[in-house]
Amino acid sequence: MKRKAEKAQAAAPVSAFAARKARQQQAQATAAAVKPPVAEPVVEPPPKRARRSLEEPVVPVAPEENRVQTRRSSRRKEEQAKVEKPTPKARNDQPPKASKKLPEHDTSKATEDQAPSDEESEEPDVVVGNTGVIGLEPIQNEEEGYESPADTAVQVQDFPLSKARLNKNSIVYSDEHRMCVRIKEKMSLVMIGHYDLWVKRGVVSLMGAKLHPSSQVYRVYAPSTHSLPVIKCVSGVNGEAEVEFKSCHSGIYRLKELSPLYQRIWNGKNTTADKLTLKGTPQSTKRTFSVLYTSADDSFKRHLRPLHLEKQWSSAIKSLSQRGGRLKTLICGPKGSGKSTFSRYLLNHLLSPAPQTETKYFNTDGVAFLDLDPGQPEFAPMGQVYLAHLRSPVFGPPFSHPSLDGSRNGTIVRSHHIGATSPKEDPDHYVLAAMDLMDRYRALQASYPQCPLIINYPGWIFGLGLEVATWLVRSLGLSDVVYMSEKGPTEVVQPLGQAAYQAKIPLTILPSQPTDFVSRSSAQLRSMQMQSYFHMSRPNGINNSLWLEQPLSRTKPFRVHYSGPQQGIQGIMVMGTEIHPDLLHEVLDGSIVAVVAVESPNAILGQNSGPMFANNANAETDGDHDVDMQDSADAVPVIGTSTIESSITRTPNEDLPYLFVGAGSSNPLDPKVSHCLGLALVRSVNVASRQLELVTPITGSTLRGVLEQGHSIVLVRGLLDNPNWAISEDYYAARAAEKRHRELIEKLKKDKGAAAAEDATLESEKQVLKDRIRRASKVPWMTVVEDNSRRQREAAQREKSLWKLRKKAYPGSDSEGDW
């Protein structure tokens, strides 16, 4: 099987579609060569990671400043006033008709226009890492789109959120922890924060689910980083539903002491509605949630928007759910089009715990969720594709449920580590993993025959990603395909419609989610999800998750022997280009690795078969036929003859078991005989004792169970984002402790006078905390910049800006350049 080193050679396009793209790019380059110069340069998308200047190593490069006024952004403003043209339907071989397409909604009705969050009113010191600002990751350069700060500051609007207004008659009871209210039919409430919801009377809708009266209590997470869930009364007794909201103390809010990304994302000061329901309680009383009538009620003045569903989305969800257990749908579309939101709504709708839904479908077998998006997975940390079996609706963003281990909501049936946030790094391995997960779903159907399937495909929908998507449509035996963009482009919609027609399944085209501004970039949300994953736990006997605010450096690690008679790690694999064994220690130390259970000694993919999705020099460049991938059996790489043990090289100095097979780049593990248990942070490599110190949320019982089954464990170092959030945790924790001590002294001064605040013990504690901050600021790979120069103030201002998603189409295509 050829790996990436062999794929890197120049080759002809793989299909007519790729050939057209190459000709379009050549024509675009020719046109650019004769175009007269313009005063305003066209700026390229940002690099994958910000780099420091050689002259000023501690100040992060700010490519955003050079990119905020582009011709594309100005052209987009002009085109926003125009009515969107519908994408032409695919014409070849009469593909099926897509659902009726309507113009996009105006971006002023965006569902996720959020503002940044900073906990402190004062500006904190800027923390800079070797790749940029720690905790505020640099923007990512994706093939299908990129994120950049907004061209101009977005003004805070008095945006309506709740239709209902609380009064004495609508409040059933309330205290400092809970409140029970009546909501009239077709009226809604919006809250920010996190809370437990109990439907006592009537029926309410929430994030696609219809919740009926029962003893079930649902945990809801509603941060400002995402659009806020809307609680709407669908029907009720005497036209009203009765719902109780209760504060919950999961500890997730404590993560603000470890990362600025978690600061000011929950509720602020009590709103007018809160004060009404807190009458008779101390003035300092505050719940973990707040009722918002409009965005102006927010004390932090953030750009809050309700999570309303498009009418076309509602119709599509109702139509898809009518298929019941026969539903097997692939949801795809460009980056930022709302695939994850639509998938979450459809999932919750299918899991609505009603005795009988409007579609006469009674769900007792749960829902299978096949997540093929390694960059923004829903129920797992980044870099993984997995099959989950859900039994209960889930209300919250991905960082509120980064793992299903021990969860009552569902389980992970099987997971595979891709080792990157995009499948384009190794599409062959990606497709093999998807095929194995689909086989696991078919096996799951033996026990749950009425279990529908939702497949979430990543935003990698152009070029080779389109080849993979169309192959999946033809091969997986689906019932439906949903494409999340009415704007095309034609180069995507036409092949996708053709594949759906050949598979005899309908293609539904829906409007994308009208999101223009968000308060966290994709890279920042990945950091938040990773940090949440490593700090989350589920103690026995507790239904909901808990988060620990202790930095990972103070967490007791697993100590695993990598050599000797008690060896627990069979090998260490580094995905991508081969490295010299002498460098393995440096590559491994302080990195994120996948803990993979290997079920066979012959678990490495061989090299005897060519790649499934690589450019082929002998491929046809004309005609309308793409690469023939319909016979998947011929395309599956065979297992090599070498075993894992025979492929291990011991490093000369540390005796680390370096596992490498391949020509130039590492062959991955075969998904059919391996699966991922989770991620771990390598805290240190103890050469003297031949041990690795691993910090991981994987339980000891899980690891013991794998070893008792006779499986071995391999650590896989992929191409994931560096754990900068973990490096800076001690510094932010020290700052938070010093702030709490400072507030205590100020309170003592106010209550007991200056003399009480000048106690020797308090002064000693103050010095200890300052020393802790000093020591925490001197860790490797991190620099604290304390000056208040103009460039630092500008960097802090960029940190507060909103992020705008820009999507790119092919040059010379029928679609808009920035759409």
UniProtKB/Swiss-Prot annotation:
A Pfam family of this chain: CLP1_P
Biased composition (Low complexity): 8-42
Function: Polynucleotide 5'-kinase involved in rRNA processing.
Biased composition regions of type Acidic residues, renumbered to the chain: 115-125
GO BP of this protein: cleavage in ITS2 between 5.8S rRNA and LSU-rRNA of tricistronic rRNA transcript (SSU-rRNA, 5.8S rRNA, LSU-rRNA); rRNA processing
The species this protein was found in: Aspergillus niger (strain ATCC MYA-4892 / CBS 513.88 / FGSC A1513)
EC number per UniProt: 2.7.1.-
Domain of life assignment: Eukaryota
Location of region: Disordered: 1-129
Family, as annotated: Belongs to the Clp1 family. NOL9/GRC3 subfamily.
Gene Ontology terms: cellular component: nucleolus
SUPFAM superfamilies associated with the record: P-loop containing nucleoside triphosphate hydrolases
Cystine bridges: none
Compositionally biased residues, Basic and acidic residues: 76-94, 101-112
Record protein name field: Polynucleotide 5'-hydroxyl-kinase grc3
GO molecular function: ATP binding; polynucleotide 5'-hydroxyl-kinase activity
Compartments where found: Nucleus, Nucleolus
Catalytic EC class: transferase
Binding site for ATP: G333, P334, K335, G336, S337, G338, K339, S340
Keywords, ordered alphabetically: ATP-binding, Kinase, Nucleotide-binding, Nucleus, rRNA processing, Transferase
Residue spans crossing the bilayer: none
